[in-house]
Amino acid sequence: MKILLLCWRDTTHPQGGGSERYLEHVARYLSDRGHEVIYRTAAHTDCRRKSVRDGITFYRGGGKLGVYPRAAIMMLLGRCGIGSLKDVDVVVDTQNGIPFFGQFFSGKPTVLLTHHCHREQWPVAGKLLASLGWFLESRISPRVHRNTQVVTVSAPSKQDLISLGFPPDNITIIHNGVDPIPATLPQLEDDGRIH
């Protein structure tokens, strides 16, 4: 299968974090099982527009907000058989407050991935952007994705999504994992001078 993952950042982004790491683990898992995985994300300083890491092809374009229209254009082109997103079989749309509306633009089956509701985070974006973002997250996304499979990482996040209007039966919880402890840990020689 050709699988498209959409996320506003990746782990090479200076502000990338846990959500991006989670999605890259999913991408690596899918790639290791023979799937073609494309990760579409925002560009950032000194990044390459296209790179391949762990069998995942990363395409970067747009900034903090520009990533959304850039991804939409690429999905529409792919829908017309043009570009790197042609022949995509399924989309994983990561909603970090704002979804990519991958189902609408790609015309392909889509899974919506969201770690949590961003109600408390929106005010730091400024009044106008916060109002628009919260409107998209709380009003538009639940309606657009009412028949979409939704994945989240905890029971409280599921309850938040239900309170926004997502159908409970469409929400699956897949808990975050942890990396295994290394077999050996690097150690410094203790000569009594290290405190």
Where are the predicted features?
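Membrane-proximal helix-turn-helix segments that form the acceptor-binding/catalytic region
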Residues: L129-V151
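Short N-terminal targeting/anchoring amphipathic segment
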Residues: Y59-G62, L76-F100, F105-S106, V111-L112
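Nucleotide-activated donor-dependent transferases that construct or modify glycoconjugates
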Residues: M1-Q15
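N-terminal strand-loop element at the rim of the active site
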Residues: R9-T12, Y29-L65
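Carbohydrate-associated surface elements
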Residues: P156, I174-G177
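Conserved donor-binding/catalytic core segment of Leloir-type glycosyltransferases
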Residues: V151, E189-H195
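Active-site proximal beta-strand in glycosyltransferases
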Residues: K2-I3, V90-D93, F105-P123, A130, ...
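Short amphipathic alpha-helix
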Residues: G17-L30
